[in-house]
Amino acid sequence: MFNSNVKLGIAPIAWTNDDMPDLGKENTFEQCISEMALAGFKGSEVGNKYPRDVKVLKKALELRDMEIASAWFSAFLTTKPYEETEKAFIEHRDFLNAMGAKVIVVSEQGHSIQGQMETPIFDGKYVLNEEEWKTLAEGLNKLGALAKEKGMKLVYHHHMGTVVQTTEEIDKLMDLTDENLVYLLFDSGHLVYSGEDALEVLKKYVNRVKHVHLKDIRKEKVEEVKRDKLSFLQGVRKGAFTVPGDGDIDFEPIFKVLDDNNYEGYLLVEAEQDPAIANPLEYAIKARKYIKEKTNL
């Protein structure tokens, strides 16, 4: 299954959480990438503890035969002047380009509640009006063109608590943006968490999917988040997310759809939970074994 153009990566968020720095504050950058390599992963996304000096970061990764797959970028197209987002995006793009990454993960954070510790994730979500949708789509097309200038692709990350979370919102985004400039990051965990049919979304947009986050969920924890009106970050602390093979999502059909459509790019494990409860190395190995078992990668 899969051709040689599919690579496996893992996100540092299991070791150190950028949104809640107390989670994994004891884990160093070096420990993080060493354990990723030890678990059998090739790529990583960029975390807060990663050096931003290209030379320093490259050397640390090359010693472990690793590379940067991408890094998250927060856009504020619906709440701030476009120029502010563009300036930050160009800087981000150039750093990732220097690191050899091919995709740029973008999420609209205007009106987002994902980082609010007390706002219930299932109740407090903002919904864009038509004018805001237009602004978002136009801005993303411009950023996508800037990515293309460097031979890179903008991959949009639908995410819990943001203005693009549901199937309906993904449909709208895909419809309003240029398919040659704005691509999709498929995240299994965020779709299932939201109550969407992740497989159907993948089937519909598989040809625009250029980056994949493999995230599993624990359904009973998500139900708890819903019932107790918890925030996204409270849900993370509760253990709503975990690695593929440890939760309730069946990844076999997901792998099959990607393989059948000749997916190329990264399959990147991203599962934020408390490292004091879920040992990052242990869970990285667990994820790696599961992927090997299901895909032979």
UniProtKB/Swiss-Prot annotation:
Keywords associated with the record: Cobalt, Lyase, Manganese
Required co-factors: glutathione; Co(2+); Mn(2+)
GO molecular function ontology, one term from the record: myo-inosose-2 dehydratase activity
The keyword Repeat appears for this protein: no
UniProt-listed GO biological process terms: inositol catabolic process
InterPro entries, sorted: IolE, IolE/MocC, IolE/XylAMocC-like, Xyl_isomerase-like_sf, Xyl_isomerase-like_TIM-brl
Leader sequence segment: none
Pathway: Polyol metabolism; myo-inositol degradation into acetyl-CoA; acetyl-CoA from myo-inositol: step 2/7
Record Pfam families: AP_endonuc_2 (PF01261)
Keyword Lyase: yes
Enzyme class, spelled out: lyase
EC number: 4.2.1.44
Cystines in this chain: none
Reaction catalyzed: scyllo-inosose = 3D-3,5/4-trihydroxycyclohexane-1,2-dione + H2O
Family: Belongs to the IolE/MocC family.
PANTHER family (alphabetical): HYDROXYPYRUVATE ISOMERASE, INOSOSE DEHYDRATASE
Protein name as annotated: Inosose dehydratase
Organism: Clostridium perfringens (strain ATCC 13124 / DSM 756 / JCM 1290 / NCIMB 6125 / NCTC 8237 / Type A)
